[in-house]
């Protein structure tokens, strides 16, 4: 594995290995320049297959160009790596079988759900027992992000580094759930704006508060605070949820979110 030194080198590799019919999950083309400038992009090339690695705060993400499913790669000294495959419909068994032979194991499946405001159920969790508000203090953002990072897989769970906390505070991107008198932190929600779409990045609830409607209260607050007063009925929302998390899936479905036939499966090593 070697560092990619410039964008021309990256382009040359993509052109060489990005042949017609190849299997690829290379989603980094638009950010390749930035990754190279940060010395965060590496590559491991073989006769017919190539693998890019992006250094993250914890571990690495791998992106591949696979032209030959019989050509083995030497990943013996590579650890703490996640590879994520986007798919619609059937699970991409060819890539999964190849990657498992190279030492990866299946981690989890995430499904994308979406809705417009007009499709969503009215709030049913407004209760005096749970108070939801925007995080106004750095310490509140810090507490929320620690909960997110502790609740989700550190390789595939979108780890939030401390360097992002101030930006999250400045942009009002964190919602906090408290008990009635604000003496107990119950949970948090991280939201992202992608164009005209309001996206849930993370939702997590403290263990002692689970099963008490905290997650529903956070989602309801997220929906209401982001509705567009001029086009309220058409305000758009999206989220990703682990397919294995049946309680969360049911909560979103009951709210009115629909699966849009877009999923990812992650494998880790």
What are these regions (language model features)?
Residues 79-91, 226-241:
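Conserved GNAT acetyl-CoA-binding A-motif
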Residues 1-28, 123-157:
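Short amphipathic alpha-helix that is part of the acyltransferase structural core
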Residues 219, 245-248, 267:
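Short glycine/proline-centered loop/turn elements that form peptide/ligand docking sites
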Residues 65-130, 263-269:
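Acyl-donor-binding surface of acyltransferase catalytic domains
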Residues 49-51, 108, 184-187, 215, ...:
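A structural microfeature
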Residues 54-57, 160-180, 185-204:
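A conserved beta-strand-loop-helix scaffold within acyl/acetyltransferase catalytic domains
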Residues 25-79, 187-201:
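Conserved donor-binding loop and adjoining core beta-sheet/short helix segment
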Residues 68-80, 205, 211-227, 250-254:
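Conserved acetyl-CoA-binding loop-helix of GNAT-fold acetyltransferases
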């Amino acid at each position: 594995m070697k560092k990619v030194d410039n964008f021309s080198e990256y382009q040359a590799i993509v052109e060489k290995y990005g042949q017609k019919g190849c299997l690829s999950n290379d989603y980094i083309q638009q950010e390749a320049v930035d990754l190279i400038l940060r010395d965060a992009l590496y590559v491991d090339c073989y006769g017919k297959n190539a693998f890019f690695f992006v250094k993250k705060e914890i571990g690495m993400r791998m992106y591949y160009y696979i032209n030959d499913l019989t050509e083995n790669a030497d990943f013996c000294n590579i650890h703490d790596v996640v590879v994520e495959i986007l798919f619609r419909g059937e699970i991409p068994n060819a890539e999964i079988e190849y990657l498992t032979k190279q030492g990866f194991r299946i981690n989890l499946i995430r499904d994308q759900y979406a809705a417009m405001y007009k499709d969503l159920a009215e709030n049913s969790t407004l209760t005096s027992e749970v108070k939801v508000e925007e995080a106004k203090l750095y310490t509140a953002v810090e507490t929320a992000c620690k909960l997110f990072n502790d609740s989700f897989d550190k390789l595939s769970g979108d780890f939030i580094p401390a360097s992002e906390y101030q930006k999250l505070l400045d942009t009002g991107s964190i919602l906090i759930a408290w008990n009635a008198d604000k003496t107990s932190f119950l949970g948090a929600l991280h939201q992202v704006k992608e164009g005209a779409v309001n996206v849930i990045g993370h939702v997590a609830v403290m263990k002692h508060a689970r099963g008490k409607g905290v997650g529903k209260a956070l989602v309801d607050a997220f929906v209401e605070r982001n509705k567009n007063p001029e086009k309220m009925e058409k305000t758009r929302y999206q989220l990703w949820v682990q397919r294995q998390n049946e309680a969360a899936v049911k909560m979103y479905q009951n709210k009115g979110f629909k699966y849009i036939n877009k999923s990812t499966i992650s494998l880790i090593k």
